[in-house]
Amino acid sequence: LQWYDKDKIIYNKINNGNESSIIYDIASKNKIRLNTCIYSINKNGNILSLNYSRLWKLWKSYGYKDLKSINDNKFESKPKNDGIYIINRDFNKNIIFSIHDAVNLCGLNNIKKDFFLCHPTFNFDGDKFVSLLRYFNDSGALISYLICTNLNNGENVILAREKVSHFEWITNNEIIVWCRNLNP
């Protein structure tokens, strides 16, 4: 549940086994349904989203279990067509950072594991976001890479790796994070 403009809220809702979200106008009580779930919204109304079905399949702590797409037979470990999506004010959805590209950035191509991206979070101005690339290693430990994506120039930078957990933007260019290994 998040604010979407000053008089509207937006929340995720499973609709007949499919991802969706509802924009609810508090004043008029009108609803608009989007055919995707949301994660983060910037001040311009752009939305970040991800594949909640994949998230549930790989990490039962998050995601939604009652989605039809969970049993998709086309599952890939490092897909080019899945990752973080951006949805603009006209509700056009496009992939902005693929799992494949994140794996390449982090130099993890030779690791034979299923990867996922999660927690995409805009900075205050909405021109950057961070996300976590994650996988479970052979001993079952959750390995994470915190990546910052600059929407103005498309640059992706690894900020921290290995054990990364909670984070929060404190300014448009600074983030506080719990981790074991910061990138130099």
Give the residues covered by each predicted segment.
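Blade-terminus and WD-like Trp-Asp/Gly-His loop motifs, strongest in beta-propeller folds
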Residues: 1-9, 39-46, 50-51, 119-129, ...
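Residue-level signature of beta-propeller blades and closely related beta-rich strand-turn architectures
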Residues: 15, 53, 135, 181-182
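Hydrophobic beta-strand positions in blades of beta-propellers and related beta-sheet-rich domains
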Residues: 21-23, 82-86, 144-148, 184
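Beta-rich catalytic cores
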Residues: 35-37, 80, 116-118, 142, ...
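Loop-centered beta-sheet repeat module
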Residues: 109-151, 155-160
